[in-house]
């Protein structure tokens, strides 16, 4: 799909090109109380009051998400007009904007339009420029057009005909909007990769499949990929990681993906993704109902690969290292048992009280491995705890960090990217719940504050660099009729890296 930018100040009568230019449809916003947006006012004048008459007649009341097509409109170059309800003007925020653009795309994709002129990006949203509106609109469109068909014997053909979108933006935002287009397309491509990996079944997306995906990314984008096998993992003494992998016939893989966009000596940002390609719970077996969704337990790994793909396409001027410990968590005759004690790469011994708390066991060795890169910061991403879903639901990812500056950067990025996160506590008092009579620490801390104690466990392995943890158990995928991976938190991570790169 082709996206282009055209500057236009509707309030100064600069709309002639939009009024006369050929297009299948022009998209206009209407607020409640019969208030026309700036672009709608100009179109109303050009069509001799048509928009006003439609609104006055009650055919378009401006309620958020409502849409109305006006066919065969005379006086303008577009063959039809799509009116989109924006809701109340004094309550128009990021969510209202996203609701409006999503409604617009759904209406357009159900038609045979090929080229669209899109004016909604110029609407004022929380003091953001129209470049932000362009990026959000493209991501919303790509979300609506995403389909996972790889496992279908006869995939349904693409039904929409939309091929080109022209965004009208404020003239002062034109340059930034062109950058936003590039970033949005790269980001959407990264999210699509993350979603594809998550949606693949566990018998296809194995640890080896993830490793091969990383190798292909490196080949496609001029990066370096290292994949460590069982013997190399054993040589590194990653006993905690190996304790999870031992009962599966699928060999574990330890993936390291290097993106170099800055000088080789520049300290990298390290992203560590949990890569459990299927999680039965091990000997602490999960209930059968809903276990199919445990193919999504590698979405942390998928988000690392998707983020680095987006970073490479954007050409960000910084260094990023992706680390992915990946394996299956299976029961078996040689599986780790509750009560077993294992030794981590760091040398700390861990009493495994519950084999279904396995994500932290593979991540702790990866976090220790990350030290060798002398990182500027390390962020781990994991579908780690059901407790995080209880605490935050499916809207916010859980953010944990003792570094206020790093946490602040990530929260700012989450707001800018419309990929929300919420900071949860990481007080030392919670560490007491991880005490063990038989090892240096236990892998679970009981029912209270389960997501917090999981983060506390990881913090024991991150003392030598700035670190943050994102628990995406509630946000990495959706259940029910809309079941599927979401691609989150790729937008948050990519925005954080864009900000760090100063781009």
Curated annotation (Swiss-Prot):
It comes from the Bacteria. It comes from Burkholderia multivorans (strain ATCC 17616 / 249). The active site is at 286, 360. Its cofactor is Mn(2+). HAMAP family: Cytosol_peptidase_M17. GO terms for cellular component: cytoplasm. Keywords: Aminopeptidase, Cytoplasm, Hydrolase, Manganese, Metal-binding, Protease. Presumably involved in the processing and regular turnover of intracellular proteins. Catalyzes the removal of unsubstituted N-terminal amino acids from various peptides. Belongs to the peptidase M17 family. It is an enzyme of class 3 (hydrolase). GO terms for biological process: proteolysis. This is Probable cytosol aminopeptidase.
């Amino acid at each position: 799909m082709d996206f282009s930018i055209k500057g236009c100040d509707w309030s100064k009568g600069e709309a002639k090109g939009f009024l006369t230019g050929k297009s299948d449809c022009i998209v206009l916003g209407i607020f409640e109380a019969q208030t026309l947006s700036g672009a709608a006012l100009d179109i109303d004048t050009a069509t001799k009051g048509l928009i006003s008459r439609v609104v006055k007649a009650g055919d378009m009341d401006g309620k958020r998400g409502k849409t109305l097509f006006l066919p065969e409109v005379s006086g303008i170059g577009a063959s039809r007009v799509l009116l989109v309800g924006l809701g109340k003007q004094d309550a128009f925020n990021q969510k209202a904007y996203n609701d409006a653009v999503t409604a617009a795309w759904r209406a357009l994709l159900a038609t045979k339009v090929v080229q669209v002129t899109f004016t909604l990006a110029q609407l004022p949203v929380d003091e953001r420029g129209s470049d932000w509106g362009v990026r959000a609109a493209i991501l919303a469109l790509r979300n609506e057009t995403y389909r996972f068909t790889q496992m279908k014997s006869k995939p349904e053909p693409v039904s929409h005909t939309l091929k080109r979108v022209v965004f009208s933006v404020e003239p002062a935002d034109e340059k930034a909007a062109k950058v936003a287009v590039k970033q949005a397309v790269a980001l959407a491509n990264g999210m699509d990769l993350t979603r594809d990996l998550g949606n693949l079944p566990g018998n296809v997306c194995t640890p080896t499949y993830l490793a091969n995906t990383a190798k292909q990314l490196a080949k496609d984008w001029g990066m370096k990929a290292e994949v460590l096998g069982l013997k190399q993992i054993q040589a590194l003494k990653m006993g905690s990681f190996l304790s999870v992998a031992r009962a599966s016939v699928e060999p574990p893989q330890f993936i390291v993906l290097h993106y170099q966009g800055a000088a080789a000596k520049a300290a990298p940002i390290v992203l560590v993704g949990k890569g459990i390609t299927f999680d039965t719970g091990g000997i602490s077996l999960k209930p059968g109902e809903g276990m199919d969704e445990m193919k999504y337990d590698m979405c942390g790994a998928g988000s690392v690969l998707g983020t680095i793909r987006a970073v490479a396409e954007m050409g960000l001027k910084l260094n990023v290292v992706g680390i992915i410990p990946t394996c299956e968590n299976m029961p078996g005759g040689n599986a780790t048992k509750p009560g077993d004690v294992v030794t981590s790469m760091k040398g700390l011994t861990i009493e495994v009280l519950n084999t279904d708390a396995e994500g932290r066991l593979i991540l702790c060795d990866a976090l220790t491995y990350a030290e060798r890169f002398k990182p500027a910061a390390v962020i781990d991403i994991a579908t780690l705890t059901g407790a995080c879903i209880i605490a935050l639901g499916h809207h916010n990812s859980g953010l944990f960090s003792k570094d206020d500056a790093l946490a602040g950067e990530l929260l700012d990025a989450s707001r800018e990217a419309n990929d929300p996160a919420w900071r949860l506590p990481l007080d030392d008092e919670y560490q007491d719940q991880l005490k063990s009579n038989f090892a240096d620490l236990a892998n679970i801390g009981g029912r209270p504050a389960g997501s917090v104690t999981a983060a506390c466990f990881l913090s024991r392995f991150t003392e030598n660099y700035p670190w943050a943890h994102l628990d995406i158990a509630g946000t990495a995928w959706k259940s029910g009729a809309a079941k599927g991976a979401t691609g989150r938190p790729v937008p948050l991570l990519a925005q954080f890296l864009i900000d760090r790169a100063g781009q």
